[in-house]
Amino acid sequence: KNKHQLNYDDLKKLITEKTKLIIINSPSNPTGSVTAKDDISKIYELCREKGIFILSDEIYSRSVFKDQGEFYSPSMIDHCNNNVLILNGFSKAFAMTGWRIGVAIGPKHLIEKMGLLLQTVNSCVPPFIQKAAIEAINGDQSAVRMMTEEYSKRRKVLVNGLNSIEGIRCHMPSGSIYAFPNISGLGMTGEEFVDLM
């Protein structure tokens, strides 16, 4: 009913004294929705007031379709100095799937703790992957734009095709590589639908 958009008032009601972190995934996996700038700003203010951290998963931040709005990061407010932590990677935008390289940006004390944890989990990302990641970020971005344009075309074909099937409704995703159809009009469970496919 709300195109998979986060409802700020509902979120606010769920926060208790135990809430330490809110995760924002925009563009979203699996719905493809992009959280609006106004909602990001309200969530940031709420979290700042209550001493809650925001972890913003921005793996699809470069995959927002031009006709569907813009991506907005809470880091634009906080610059990752206080209560915002950004996670991003190279697998989606730069087709570096399986290379296992990403980036975390946040308050110094959190990044230091993450670094200690990472030392025990993963000894080292191979140097050639690190160099490729630097080139991906600093180099020509035309391939990223071309991929996003192609995904936008495919998204339209997929969603229009899904919506042409009686009993299926699907909102046009704003970003990422996902579509999230509602099959409730088919009168079957998700498992039954998958088995039928």
Locate the predicted segments by residue.
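PLP-dependent class I/II
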Residues: K1-M197
